[in-house]
């Protein structure tokens, strides 16, 4: 049995490029969502994500099967950058915010250029990662609610604006310490972040909501008590019903045309 070293090398380069880009998405995803273990690099995570994305892009260009194949990327990237600059102006942010927006826009350029089929694969990876993490954290959160002592450390973020008891698999905001059943926020700094991101991930998983990781995401969304998450979920459900209704209408119309032919 002969092994084609050239083909194997080209295949490896494509795989490495894909792994680098998945890593860049991981950094950008968890960094932008303010998870507690990304707090030490919160100020410069866009640079790390951009460097990983750049390495992936350059390596992909040397492969005979590149992973950055989409041609429609310039307009959405410019729109994203302009929106970011506008938000910075409205909030009167400093130069660091504008630099961060530039790196985020460059990262979005890579995302818009990335192969759409592979992009669905990445969304599934993120859904499985977060869904798996939530499944592990649910029993510990239940133990906390019933009063079982769990190891934790104090955590302060953003000059004291956020103050938590960090149980590693989930956070409890200090303002919620005496609440009978606090809002579940997992590893995120606010329950709203958990509600929003689980809803958006569920949107990418339309048609696969019965999978274990999507059920886990749905539970996390529900117990986050996030109004934003509930609004997103409602919009997604109505969108799904509209699409399914459209499919049924097209199928019925096709049958009518076939029978009348």
Regions found by a protein language model. Name each.
Residues 124-148, 172-225, 231-242:
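Alpha-helical transmembrane segments of multi-pass inner-membrane proteins
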Residues 40-59, 98-107, 194-202, 230-238:
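Membrane-embedded alpha-helical segments of multi-pass membrane proteins
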Residues 147-168:
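Juxtamembrane non-transmembrane "cap" segments at the membrane-aqueous interface
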Residues 53-65, 110-119, 204-209, 238-246:
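Structural signal for the C-terminal ends of transmembrane alpha-helices
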Residues 54-59, 88-142:
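Transmembrane alpha-helical segments and their membrane-water interfaces
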Residues 1-63, 81-87:
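N-terminal signal-anchor transmembrane segment
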Residues 11-22, 62-77, 122-126, 212-213:
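Membrane-interfacial loop-to-transmembrane alpha-helix junctions, especially the N-terminal start
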Residues 4-12, 27-41, 233-261:
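Alpha-helical transmembrane segments and terminal signal-anchor/GPI-anchor hydrophobic tails
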């Amino acid at each position: 049995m002969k092994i084609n070293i050239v083909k194997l090398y080209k295949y490896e380069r494509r795989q490495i490029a894909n792994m680098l880009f998945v890593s860049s998405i991981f950094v950008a995803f968890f960094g932008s969502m303010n998870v507690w273990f990304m707090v030490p690099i919160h100020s410069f995570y866009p640079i790390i994500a951009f460097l990983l994305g750049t390495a992936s892009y350059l390596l992909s260009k040397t492969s005979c099967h590149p992973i950055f194949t989409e041609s429609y990327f310039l307009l959405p990237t410019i729109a994203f950058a302009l929106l970011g600059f506008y938000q910075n102006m409205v909030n009167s942010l400093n130069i660091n915010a504008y630099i961060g927006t530039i790196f985020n826009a460059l990262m979005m350029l890579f995302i818009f250029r990335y192969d759409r089929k592979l992009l669905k694969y990445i969304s599934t990876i993120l859904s499985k990662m977060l869904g798996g993490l939530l499944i592990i954290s649910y029993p510990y959160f239940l133990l906390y609610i019933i009063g079982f002592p769990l190891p934790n450390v104090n955590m302060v973020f953003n000059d004291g604006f956020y103050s938590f008891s960090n149980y590693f698999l989930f956070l409890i905001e200090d303002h919620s310490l005496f609440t009978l059943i606090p809002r579940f926020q997992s590893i995120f700094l606010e329950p709203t972040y958990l509600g929003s991101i689980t809803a958006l991930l569920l949107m990418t998983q339309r048609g696969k909501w019965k999978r274990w990781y999507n059920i886990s995401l749905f539970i996390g969304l529900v117990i986050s008590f996030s109004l934003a998450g509930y609004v997103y979920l409602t919009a997604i459900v109505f969108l799904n019903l509209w699409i399914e209704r459209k499919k049924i209408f097209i199928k019925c119309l096709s049958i009518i045309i076939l029978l009348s032919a």
